[in-house]
């Protein structure tokens, strides 16, 4: 049985397979930066299950996602940045940050923050490391370039995923209908108004 966990500051309807976790309203970028902290607050509940996957609320499932995504540590190649030269990928280059990636130590892929997971043990292990790093940095007013995604990419360089999913699982909506884009969509990263969401 699959259980869906929803982290929200709003009141929402619940059902037997949905668990609601209330979070406080905070200004951008805290809701995304602190997502791994939210996961750790629910670690006791999450640990009841064999696998745990996270995906952004603005993702749309348009095809079957099945056992092919099951592995210990799963990450999804970024629909754009994975194909850029390593030195041009937008890792956090601030040496004061725990998400820092120096030139020459980039990973094989750059991963999107929108869909990741794996065995519950490995997912919570990653979540704990990232949550601790975020908490430590916030005490010094340090926020990485791409927030939780920057921390995740640093972690995945040090702990490579056992499965790298193609951009089919974080398919940029603006690529729909593009005959030159070599992937079929399974999970779509929907277009959004960034200014509206962050204000």
Report each predicted region and the residues it spans:
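PAPS-dependent sulfotransferase catalytic domain
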Residues: 68-122, 129-130, 149
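Short, hydrophobic beta-strand segments that form beta-sheet elements in well-ordered domains
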Residues: 1-9, 53, 75
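Conserved glycosyltransferase catalytic-site signature
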Residues: 32, 36, 57-59, 145-150
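A structural signal for short, well-ordered beta-strand segments and their strand-loop junctions
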Residues: 5-6, 52-56, 117, 163-166
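GT-A fold catalytic core of metal-dependent nucleotide-sugar glycosyltransferases
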Residues: 36-86
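Catalytic core and acceptor-binding pocket of nucleotide-sugar-dependent glycosyltransferases
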Residues: 105-193
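Active-site-proximal specificity loops/subdomain of glycosyltransferases
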Residues: 7-50
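Short, polar loop motifs at secondary-structure junctions
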Residues: 5-13, 57-64, 169-170
């Amino acid at each position: 049985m699959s259980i869906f966990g929803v982290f929200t500051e709003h009141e929402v309807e619940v059902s037997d397979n949905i668990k609601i976790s209330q979070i406080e309203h905070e200004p951008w970028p805290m809701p995304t930066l602190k997502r791994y902290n939210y996961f750790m607050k629910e670690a006791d509940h999450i640990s009841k299950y064999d696998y745990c996957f996270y995906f952004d609320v603005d993702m749309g499932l348009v095809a079957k996602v099945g056992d092919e995504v099951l592995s210990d540590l799963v990450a999804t190649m970024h629909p754009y940045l994975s194909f850029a030269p390593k030195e041009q990928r937008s890792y956090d280059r601030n040496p004061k940050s725990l998400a820092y990636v120096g030139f020459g130590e980039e990973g094989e892929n750059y991963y999107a923050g929108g869909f990741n997971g794996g065995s519950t043990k490995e997912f919570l292990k990653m979540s704990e490391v990232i949550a601790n790093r975020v908490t430590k940095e916030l005490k010094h007013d340090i926020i990485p370039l791409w927030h939780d995604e920057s921390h995740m990419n640093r972690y995945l360089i040090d702990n490579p995923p056992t499965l790298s999913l193609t951009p089919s699982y974080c398919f940029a909506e603006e690529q729909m209908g593009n005959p030159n884009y070599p992937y079929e969509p399974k999970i779509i990263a929907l277009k959004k108004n960034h200014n509206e969401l962050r204000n």
